[in-house]
């Protein structure tokens, strides 16, 4: 007797809402960066080590940007944990391997804080890759 595959269960509504909020926040953050003169090189760059929300370039600078969306900007500021920072650094290294022509650029790890009805807040050099 052949097994029948049960239909996959849809994701929980709160997970769908969180995903949509994240996509919206990343779109707002990317638009804000472009208005500041950055060129978006990648969005949601996935690696086995982690994901980079936005990779942006301005002149000879590459910014790896983590976007944090919360109800309040203060809450967003505290949402970037040391473990996440390490995953972003590892993902940035993978991005540089895939994009070696940018290896000589200045590298920076930024954060973009996004809250409803507020302009995104860009935090250049929010953390560094030093051990």
From Swiss-Prot:
UniProt cross-references to Pfam families, sorted A to Z: UPF0102
Top-rank lineage group of the source organism: Bacteria
GO terms assigned for molecular function: nucleic acid binding
InterPro entries recorded: Restrct_endonuc-II-like, tRNA_endonuc-like_dom_sf, UPF0102_YraN-like
Family from the record: Belongs to the UPF0102 family.
Entry-linked HAMAP family: UPF0102
Name of this protein: UPF0102 protein RPD_0400
Organism: Rhodopseudomonas palustris (strain BisB5)
